[in-house]
Regions:
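Catalytic-site neighborhood detector that most strongly recognizes the C-terminal catalytic loop/helix
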Residues: 25, 132-157
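C-terminal secondary-structure termini that scaffold catalytic or DNA-interacting sites
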Residues: 27-49, 56-58, 80, 158-170
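Short, cationic motifs built from Arg/Lys/His that form the positively charged side of catalytic pockets
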Residues: 1-4, 50-52, 62-66, 111
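Short, charged phosphate-coordinating catalytic segments
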Residues: 1-27, 126
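Catalytic tyrosine of NAD(P)H-dependent dehydrogenase/reductases that use a Tyr as the general acid/base
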Residues: 107-108, 144
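C-terminal catalytic core of tyrosine-transesterase DNA break-rejoin enzymes
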Residues: 1-5, 92-99, 109-135, 157
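Active-site/catalytic core of tyrosine-dependent DNA strand-transfer enzymes
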Residues: 53-102
């Protein structure tokens, strides 16, 4: 999911171990040059209307997120109860990376990594498209897939191809 979809999640969007994406946040500049963040009651594209499933290993975080703020309309709010914007997510992630002493990652890099993990594990294309909110798997393959294999893993893959296995080579 995108950070704009995350910023627009409401408690009613949760289902058992999944959540429905039905809206997104948009950002634009006002006449005085300040950014305005608004939730639109529709996603960026038709493919954005979807249900995203949560892997079993992450069920624990679902309950933690849901119970952390049960009385507000939006799931992710700041200390004052105000809905967190996409910029809040980006800044928080940056602070966490700094605290951990790791290279800064953007929410979009995390999304790209998730898409790559799904593709690398040969997940069904329809499921990938649903999780990512894409109408065409080529979008995920072209813009989100990064080769995460080590050189040794690449050597093993290429060496396993019968035509390249070296049978008969000197």
């Amino acid at each position: 999911m995108t950070k704009a979809e995350l910023a627009a999640l409401k408690h009613g969007d949760w289902e058992e171990h999944s959540f429905r994406i039905r809206r997104t946040e948009t950002r634009y500049r006002s006449e005085d040059g300040t950014y305005i963040y608004e939730v639109k009651e529709f996603p960026k594209t038709a493919a954005g209307v979807r249900t995203v499933v949560i892997p079993k290993a992450w069920f624990w975080i679902e309950e933690k997120i849901r119970s952390s703020n049960p009385n507000e309309e939006y799931i992710f709010v700041d200390a004052k109860g105000k809905r967190m914007t996409t910029n809040c997510f980006r800044r928080r992630l940056e602070r966490v990376c700094n605290r951990l002493g790791i290279v800064k990652k953007s929410p979009h890099k995390i999304r790209k990594t998730y898409g790559s993990i799904l593709l690398d594990n040969h997940v069904d294309n329809r499921l990938i498209m649903g999780q990512m909110g894409h109408t065409d798997i080529r979008c995920t393959e072209t813009h989100y897939h990064r080769n995460r294999r080590s050189v040794q893993q690449k050597i093993q893959i290429v060496s396993a191809i019968p035509e390249l296995s070296g049978v008969g080579a000197k």
